[in-house]
């Protein structure tokens, strides 16, 4: 089985020892992705944070040879239940009719108190 590491730009990757994504056979597993911009601070609102998370995930998918159309599952973690409409709207704008299996849960906190959203994704590479 092929196992390929896809790095990202998160400072946590080297410290914790993880990859943004791992390709294992025909599967792409994208790690929990927080709204960490290349430069500057994360956006404030749940909608903008979700869009940034998905943009980062999209880049990892591309480097793995996949697209959003290959995504079969997402998991969204929110720190505030009232953020689900905005996070859901951003998710829906990106995935549209792709409609991956999706779970959204509310957690007590994320690693950085500025983070309101974190998203994981799984994709299957096309033959």
What name fits each language-model region?
Residues 1-127:
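Short, polar/acidic, helix-capping and beta-turn segments at strand->helix junctions
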């Amino acid at each position: 089985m092929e196992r390929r590491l896809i790095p990202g730009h998160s400072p946590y990757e080297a410290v914790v020892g993880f990859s943004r994504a791992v390709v294992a056979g025909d599967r792409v597993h994208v790690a929990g992705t927080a709204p960490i911009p290349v430069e500057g601070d994360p956006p404030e609102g749940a909608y903008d944070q979700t869009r940034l998370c998905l943009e980062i995930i999209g880049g990892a998918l591309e480097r793995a040879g996949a697209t959003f159309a290959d995504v079969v599952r997402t998991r969204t973690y929110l720190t505030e239940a009232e953020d689900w409409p905005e996070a859901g709207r951003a998710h829906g704008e990106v995935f549209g009719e792709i409609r991956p299996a999706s779970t959204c849960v509310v957690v007590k906190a994320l690693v950085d108190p500025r983070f309101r959203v974190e998203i994981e994704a799984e994709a299957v590479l096309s033959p």
